[in-house]
Swiss-Prot record:
Keywords: Ribonucleoprotein, Ribosomal protein, RNA-binding, rRNA-binding. It comes from Lactobacillus acidophilus (strain ATCC 700396 / NCK56 / N2 / NCFM). It comes from the Bacteria. One of its GO terms (cellular component) is cytoplasm. This is Small ribosomal subunit protein bS6. InterPro entries: Ribosomal_bS6, Ribosomal_bS6_sf, Ribosomal_S6_plastid/chlpt, Transl_elong_EF1B/ribsomal_bS6. The keyword Transcription regulation does not apply.
Length: 98
């Protein structure tokens, strides 16, 4: 089976303190690794202002992960967990070209 490259962008609530934000990012990086993904890059884009209000917030901390996976298990598990997690305002997954 061919390896697919994915990019996940997610927005963390701005009122999360640095220690909890770091733990959250490490947790989601681990979710990818535990489900067969290989992390290429995980970087913080910092706090940015939104064009419109999301859940009563006007800004959020953006984080981007790039990883490869043989199947969609890592993407599906990340998606499932990020929908449950109250600290994540939005997330988007994109399948990248080779």
């Amino acid at each position: 089976m061919a390896t697919t490259k994915y990019e996940v962008t997610y927005i963390i609530k701005p009122d999360i303190d640095e220690d909890n934000k770091k733990a959250l990012v490490e947790n989601y990086d681990k979710v990818i690794a535990d489900n067969g993904g290989t992390m290429v890059e995980s970087k913080d884009w910092g706090k940015r202002r939104f064009a419109y209000e999301i859940d009563k917030y006007r800004e959020g901390t953006y984080h981007i992960m790039t990883f490869t996976a043989d199947n969609a298990d890592a993407v599906n598990e990340f998606s499932r967990l990020s929908k449950i997690d109250n600290a994540i305002l939005r997330s988007m997954t994109v399948k990248l070209d080779k």
